[in-house]
């Protein structure tokens, strides 16, 4: 049996009272979403949260929960969705205390159930920004990145497997939010500035309704 993680009782009243907008950011490795997130944060003053970073930070912290997470990952099991959600909630509450104007939640949700759980326990996302790039382009970008970073083990086969995993897990998420009218599909094949112009147009429209 896989190790378990004890859940915390988290008071979300300050977060709900703040009523700030939440945006989910979805895009494959090499889609350029990291660069776009940096630009969005600089322009709008939103708080950028990455569920992967929050998990890594908790493991590094040496806390009892971090030790439980390490045990789960070492056993080859997946970290339960609700544990990731607790980490996100705690990070959001800390940011609200510091006066956050809203959130960009990166690499989230990874599956439909994760998005539904977030929205039922916290609040609905205003928009889901999907940075859409053709698979061939992603492979080229990742191979180029591997050469320049010295990660020669990132060969075409490994990269294609990573992309396949991303596409198969993310397709239902994209379809789900598209059906709810919340998905903004951004063609992320162009220049950084061209892509950002599309992002800004959509975020301005969404935030003007607040």
Curated annotation (Swiss-Prot):
GO cellular component, one term: cytosol
Cross-referenced Gene3D superfamilies: P-loop containing nucleotide triphosphate hydrolases
Top EC class of this enzyme: transferase
Region (NMP): 50-79
Positions of transmembrane segments: none
Region (LID): 144-154
GO molecular function, one term: ATP binding
PROSITE patterns xrefs: ADENYLATE_KINASE
Binding-site residues for AMP, renumbered to this chain: 51, 56, 77-79, 107-110, 114, 151, 162
SUPFAM superfamilies in the record: P-loop containing nucleoside triphosphate hydrolases
CDD domains: ADK
EC number annotated for this UniProt entry: 2.7.4.3
HAMAP family per record: Adenylate_kinase_Adk, Adenylate_kinase_AK1
Known partners and oligomeric status: Monomer.
Entry text on domains: Consists of three domains, a large central CORE domain and two small peripheral domains, NMPbind and LID, which undergo movements during catalysis. The LID domain closes over the site of phosphoryl transfer upon ATP binding. Assembling and dissambling the active center during each catalytic cycle provides an effective means to prevent ATP hydrolysis.
Name this polypeptide is given: Adenylate kinase isoenzyme 1
